[in-house]
Amino acid sequence: MRRRPLCTSASRVTASLLLSFLAVSSAAELPILPAPPISPQPHSSEKDFSLRHIFHHGTYKYPELHRRLDVPENAAVWAAEHLHSEHREPVPRLRVKAEPMSIQRLADRSKEAIDGILEWGRMKGRAVQLAEDDWTIDEIAGPNVTDRETVLSFARMASNAYILEPNTGEWEDVGGGFNYTEDFGWESDGLRGHIFADTENSTVVIGLKGTSPAMFDGSETTTKDKENDNLFFSCCCGQGGQFLWRQVCDCQTSAYTCNSTCLVTALREKNRYYYAAQDLYHNVTALYPHAEIWMAGHSLGGAVSSFLSLTFGHPAVTFEAVPEAMPASRLGLPVPPGHEIGSLQKRKMTGGYHFGHTADPIYMGQCNQATSVCTFGGYALQSVCHTGKKCVYDTVKDLGWRVGIGTHKIVEVIKDVIEKYDAPPICEPYINCTDCYTWKYFESNGTETTTTSTSKPTSTSKSSKSNTRTRTETCKTPGWWGCLDETTTGTQTSTSTPKHTSTSSTSTCKTPGWFGCKGRQRRANHNNNKVLAHNYPRPSTHRNNNILFLPNINFFMSVPRLVRRLSRRRRPSLPNKTEVVNSSANHFVYVLHA
């Protein structure tokens, strides 16, 4: 190849040198550009999980109990509807797809920092105001809730019970050295956590399951469950609603009006399930300090999983969870600046996904009607708002289901809902939601007392057999069938010996209901009017002045079946001078005139 001859012209050489100097000087003045960002390592799109540990933390009967059972790698694990179920199935493959997600959480999530924030909120009844610098938005690997198999795996991890083969592992006490080996029934009290880890121990799922609450009082634990749930999930401690709701405080001042100062004082009692879950969480993070934590849970366990998710900033996938936005606010969980305190349902980037179907009254916030099983059990579940995003299967429209508590169990949800649909529902935030919208809350100085005054007219002779009750003050709680204020009979007097005397009294109804005041009432003697109970069981304590209501409901009978049975039933033959004063699907009330 022929080489190009060198340039010998002085002018050309000078021009070339000048251009070279200019290029070098210009490059020196230019700013040094940063290196292009290194693309983040792609999150593993598929993870296989297996059961590694089972934690059990006591709540009421054994509050200091905390045990751990390690599951061997090749142990045979079976799934069942409950611990004593005869029907068992081998646990299928737990495969989960992951995807990048953004989550807003506290920058300092240490135990000491979180405990200080929660203690302040517990004493004040509201979340502490934190600066914007205290929060961070992190991109982490989260579950892909658009994948059907991922949703199924989370539902199985939130299942009721996992049973190991006999003689597989032993329970060990986690700290404290408390020995409950000889105590019977410790497994039925408390919160149980099933710990799943992937093959690389990079992601851990905590599946929480609370002990199934009994519907009717039979033990101290059941009563404590009702007190705990009615404090956090009802509008005002179970007051101002159904007759059978268990009342756990006296903060209602009038109809749909609640003293928030009184309510905060009642809420200072720690939520046993939430604090037990925190202790369980810290033990899991100690075992897996570098792993990303995901949460799963069903029903009450789903609500507690959501509490942990909002507190420590982890993704959560729950199933048929009790609406938890209102109790999360009452726990004083922290919220980022710019968010209205008490409206956690409007908070974004929480990482929470709540799956459920429209036929479940607990998930939909409808298990508070007069004929609901929750009401019969004394539970006042009035909260309706979820945090994060709701993922709703419309089983009422798509499958023709009727609303009922029987569709709440996780086994039915897996087999009859998730596996029946070809794809999971779309998860959307439900921000146009308000808890207890008919209620008014006010703050006070905490020194108010409720008093009841009675008038005592002078008397010159004995009262007669028939008494007429009149009120001397304005009715504070009007109802459908008259005033619902509780009446306390004053001293019966008369100025002579007439046939009828009048009794004046004043009252304050603490707990209004549909058919009268729920408080204890003193009945006057009514000899002229007698209530006839015609071949019916002994009535309950539900009395309303001169009328005795006779419940005739099978608690476990469906409403349509009840209506059909009542429509076929003939009313009993009655004596003369008998008046039917009220008849409904729930009661037959007759009054026999003397």
Swiss-Prot record:
Glycoprotein in keyword set: yes
GO BP terms, alphabetized: multivesicular body membrane disassembly; neutral lipid catabolic process; phosphatidylserine catabolic process; piecemeal microautophagy of the nucleus
Residue intervals annotated with topology Lumenal: 34-594
Compartment(s) where it occurs, according to its Swiss-Prot or TrEMBL record: Endosome, Multivesicular body membrane; Prevacuolar compartment membrane
Primary subcellular site in the record, as a coarse category: membrane
SUPFAM superfamilies tied to this protein: alpha/beta-Hydrolases
UniProt-recorded Gene Ontology molecular function terms: phospholipase activity; triacylglycerol lipase activity
Pfam families registered for this protein in UniProt: Lipase_3
Active-site feature positions: 299 (charge relay system)
Source organism superkingdom: Eukaryota
Biased composition (Low complexity): 447-469
Entry membrane topology: Single-pass type II membrane protein
Glycosylation sites: 144, 179, 201, 259, 283, 432, 445, 576, 582
Gene Ontology cellular component list: membrane; multivesicular body membrane; vacuolar lumen
Catalytic activity, reaction form: a triacylglycerol + H2O = a diacylglycerol + a fatty acid + H(+)
Region (Disordered) residue spans: 447-473, 489-509
Name of the top EC class for this enzyme: hydrolase
Regions of this protein lying in the Cytoplasmic compartment: 1-12
Enzyme Commission designation: 3.1.1.3
Keyword Lipid metabolism: yes
Subunit description: Binds to both phosphatidylinositol (PI) and phosphatidylinositol 3,5-bisphosphate (PIP2).
Function of the molecule: Lipase which is essential for lysis of subvacuolar cytoplasm to vacuole targeted bodies and intravacuolar autophagic bodies. Involved in the lysis of intravacuolar multivesicular body (MVB) vesicles. The intravacuolar membrane disintegration by ATG15 is critical to life span extension.
PANTHER family: LIPASE ATG15-RELATED (PTHR47175:SF2)
Protein name as catalogued: Putative lipase ATG15-1
Organism: Phaeosphaeria nodorum (strain SN15 / ATCC MYA-4574 / FGSC 10173)
Upper lineage: Eukaryota, Fungi, Dikarya, Ascomycota, Pezizomycotina
